[in-house]
């Protein structure tokens, strides 16, 4: 009788410890995932030499990427329609 009570108690303790350990791992998972997603140092993008759609520009300097033109009225890169 004492042995069965001891085994039952040991089983409950083990179940509690395993549950607590898995729960703490689950709490760390979102932090690890976010740190991997926002790790910008590993995947630094190349800087473009030209400016894309909506970027501010100076008219006449040809700073916009191909197929874009600097609008003299708004002073930002727009799609060049070839007028």
UniProtKB/Swiss-Prot annotation:
Its tissue distribution reads: Expressed by the venom gland.
InterPro entries for the chain:
Huwentoxin-1, Huwentoxin_CS1
One Pfam family cited in the UniProt record for this chain: Toxin_12
Keywords attached to this entry: Amidation, Disulfide bond, Ion channel impairing toxin, Knottin, Neurotoxin, Presynaptic neurotoxin, Secreted, Signal, Toxin, Voltage-gated sodium channel impairing toxin
Where is this chain's protein located in or outside the cell? Secreted
Which cysteines pair up through disulfides? They are 50-65, 57-70, 64-77
- The residues the entry assigns to the signal sequence are 1-21
Of the GO CC terms on this record, one is: host cell presynaptic membrane
Q: Which GO terms describe its molecular function?
A: ion channel inhibitor activity; sodium channel regulator activity; toxin activity
The record describes its quaternary structure and partners as: Monomer.
Biological function = Selective antagonist of neuronal tetrodotoxin (TTX)-sensitive voltage-gated sodium channels (IC(50)=1270 nM on Nav1.1/SCN1A, 270 nM on Nav1.2/SCN2A, 491 nM on Nav1.3/SCN3A and 232 nM on Nav1.7/SCN9A). This toxin suppress Nav1.7 current amplitude without significantly altering the activation, inactivation, and repriming kinetics. Short extreme depolarizations partially activate the toxin-bound channel, indicating voltage-dependent inhibition of this toxin. This toxin increases the deactivation of the Nav1.7 current after extreme depolarizations.
Q: Which family does it belong to?
A: Belongs to the neurotoxin 10 (Hwtx-1) family. 15 (Hntx-3) subfamily.
| Domain description | The presence of a 'disulfide through disulfide knot' structurally defines this protein as a knottin.
Q: What else is known?
A: Negative results: has no activity on Nav1.4, Nav1.5, Nav1.8 and Nav1.9 sodium and calcium currents.
What is the official name of this protein in its record?
Answer: Hainantoxin-III 10
Taxonomic source organism:
Cyriopagopus hainanus
High-level lineage? Eukaryota, Metazoa, Ecdysozoa, Arthropoda, Chelicerata
């Amino acid at each position: 009788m004492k042995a069965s009570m001891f085994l039952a108690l040991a089983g409950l303790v083990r179940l509690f410890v395993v549950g607590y350990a898995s729960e703490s791992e689950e709490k760390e998972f979102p932090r690890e995932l976010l740190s991997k997603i926002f790790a910008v140092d590993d995947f630094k993008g190349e800087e473009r030499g030209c400016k894309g759609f909506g970027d501010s520009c100076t008219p006449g300097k040809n700073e916009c990427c191909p197929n874009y033109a600097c609008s003299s009225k708004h002073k930002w890169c727009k799609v060049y329609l070839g007028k």
